[in-house]
A protein has these predicted regions:
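Nucleotide-activated chemistry modules centered on ATP-dependent adenylation/adenylyltransferase
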Residues: 1-62, 78-375
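Short, glycine-rich nucleotide/cofactor-binding loops
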Residues: 62-72
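Long, structured ligand/cofactor-binding scaffold of large enzymes
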Residues: 74-76
Length: 375
């Protein structure tokens, strides 16, 4: 396991590459932002939105997928304030929404938008979450489908071809899908987690009826092509600055958590549902890094902390089994602690963790694994 010389990302991060100086592509992407002609990018954005803007006001200008989080709150506010767009906000609601998530959703609506909320069948959602956990190591799998598929379905149903997303996570965090346009190819590769391993249509093998999977399937190619559905990343046309945007949305009433989220030291991200901490924990066991590493890298890029300070934060906050909803999590998915450990063992990269003399993964008194490699 090797680590970037500039930030803290390891070479186990999917899609990450290193140059000959040992600097990762995420760091290089961030530095490249300073070389981009953002005025030219802005003009390109204007050309795109003018192509799709409703001329007679009879329809919405675009769809903005939202969660009530800091990014989608900023997206909606920005395109309305700066360009006079009339967006339709679309939210795929996770089954395990928490009060703070609902509070931020209501705050977003109060800013002044038309808003559609899609609530999936909670019984089917739970089954899909259990499949995601046991087969893919991702309990938030159905959400990662629905947040892409439902806005695309609404776009087709309401005949609104332009969908405006926020940052391109593949570009922002050093992945391979760095284009400006979110098209079907990008969606199939990056926008439906594990579609290559588990196409949603194959979930019927687990006893779920195909008609119950409609929210998690994209419109047909013909429907998408006929309407000309086009998804773009706002972050491809405007310099993305998380901290400036956070300041703006807090001024609009966005609320952060009163304490850091489990697995990190920050309190401003992934505030809407219960099990994101578990998602981040499984990321850690698979790749040897989690949400604290993500946040530390961002802080390093923006010169808010040094690499050494980031190392200490990661060591303090990362790699522990989430406890806030753990008992509820086990009960929800009908698991014993032993069964949970078995799932962890199934998806953990055993080469990254300490083992006992019998070759099994070593656990401390709280059941936590011990990572062998550190930046």
């Amino acid at each position: 396991m090797e680590f970037c010389k500039s930030c803290l990302y390891p070479n186990t991060k999917p899609g990450l590459t290193f140059n000959h100086d040992g600097v990762c592509s995420a760091c290089l992407n961030h530095k490249e932002k300073n070389k981009i002609d953002w005025d030219e990018r802005k003009q390109h954005f204007i050309e795109i939105i003018e192509k799709f803007r409703s001329r007679d006001g009879s329809n919405y200008d675009c769809i903005i997928p939202v969660s009530g989080g800091k990014d989608s709150t900023y997206q909606a506010y920005f395109v309305k304030k700066e360009f006079g767009l009339k967006p339709l906000l679309v939210n795929f609601i996770p089954r395990d929404l928490v009060p703070l998530g609902r509070k931020n959703i209501e705050n977003l609506k109060k800013i002044g938008f038309d808003y559609i909320e899609f609530t999936p069948n909670p019984i089917v959602y739970r089954k899909l979450a259990k499949i995601g956990l046991t087969e893919l190591g991702d309990v938030t799998w159905p959400e990662h489908h629905g947040l892409f598929t439902v806005p695309t379905k609404i776009a087709v149903a309401y005949k609104i071809p332009l969908i405006i997303w926020g940052e391109n996570p593949q570009s922002e965090y050093g992945g391979s899908g760095t284009g400006e346009i979110l098209d079907r190819e990008w969606l199939l590769k990056h926008g439906g987690y594990f579609l290559d391993k588990m196409p949603i249509e194959k979930v019927t093998q687990f006893g779920i009826e195909s008609e119950d999977l409609k929210p998690y399937s994209y419109p047909t190619d013909k429907e998408i092509t006929n309407l000309g559905v086009t998804g773009i990343f706002l972050g491809s046309y405007f310099k993305w600055d998380i901290f400036k945007q956070l300041e703006i949305v807090r001024g609009l009433g966005f609320s952060v958590s009163d304490k850091p989220k489990e697995g990190t030291y920050q309190n401003w991200e992934n505030l809407d549902e219960k099990y994101t901490g578990m998602h981040d924990y499984f990321k850690w066991i698979k790749y040897g890094f989690g949400r604290a590493t993500d946040h530390a890298c961002i802080d390093i890029w923006y010169n808010r902390i040094t690499r050494d300070e980031g190392r200490k934060l990661v060591s303090e906050y990362e790699g522990k089994i989430p406890t806030w909803y753990f008992d509820e999590f086990l009960q929800d998915f009908e698991l014993t602690r032993t069964q949970f450990y078995e799932i962890v063992d199934k998806f953990a990269n055993h080469a990254l963790f300490k083992k006992d003399t019998d070759g099994k993964l070593h656990r401390d008194a709280e059941g936590n694994l011990e990572l062998l490699y550190h930046p």
